[in-house]
């Protein structure tokens, strides 16, 4: 039988090490998608919440609902909300990453139908990983649409294709520059 030992004190150490390198105003998100990469999302989320993490992130709405039902009270970002899960996402007050015009429009329609004002969302850009996300040339549409919507922008983010490298690669540098140009429009 295989087993996995999780040393929560090591998680504590890593959290405080990362936090010490950030400005006090910088928000920190703990990613616990895919059952915290196989190490039990509820245990990890509870520990991160007790340490003072600002937000938890999951891949899908069902993962966020599981955490909410198990008393995780900090905001939960859902990276890949699907059209069929938007009502549940709203019901549990999960925060969606909006990565397409269709998701933006459908979620805004739902929020307006509920008469909710300024529901927090996150905008995901594709700066080179080429999975999902808005392209940089859609920024004007996003900004105009946000200004007319019942949605409130909480963050803008992307995903570096080579983020595990110690020194940014040429590809990562290009993605960072694209992202910086996007941010100037907000």
At which residue positions do the language-model features occur?
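Active-site-proximal beta-alpha core segment in soluble small-molecule metabolic enzymes
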Residues: 2-6, 10, 26-186
């Amino acid at each position: 039988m295989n087993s996995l030992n999780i040393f929560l004190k090591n998680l504590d150490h890593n959290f405080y090490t990362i936090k010490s390198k950030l400005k006090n105003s910088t928000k920190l998100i703990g990613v616990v998608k895919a059952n915290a990469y196989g190490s039990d999302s509820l245990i990890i989320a509870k520990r991160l919440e007790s340490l003072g993490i600002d937000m938890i992130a999951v891949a899908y709405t069902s993962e966020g609902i599981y955490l909410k039902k198990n008393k995780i009270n900090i905001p939960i970002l859902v990276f890949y909300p699907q059209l069929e899960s938007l009502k549940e996402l709203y019901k549990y007050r999960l925060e969606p990453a909006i990565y397409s015009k269709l998701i933006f429009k459908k979620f805004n329609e739902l929020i307006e139908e509920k008469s909710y004002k300024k529901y927090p969302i996150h905008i995901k850009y594709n700066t080179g990983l080429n999975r999902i996300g808005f392209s940089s040339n859609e920024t004007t549409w996003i900004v105009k649409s946000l200004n007319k919507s019942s949605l409130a922008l909480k963050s803008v983010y992307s995903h570096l294709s080579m983020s595990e490298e110690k020194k940014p690669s040429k590809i990562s540098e290009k993605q960072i520059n694209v992202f910086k140009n996007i941010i100037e429009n907000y």
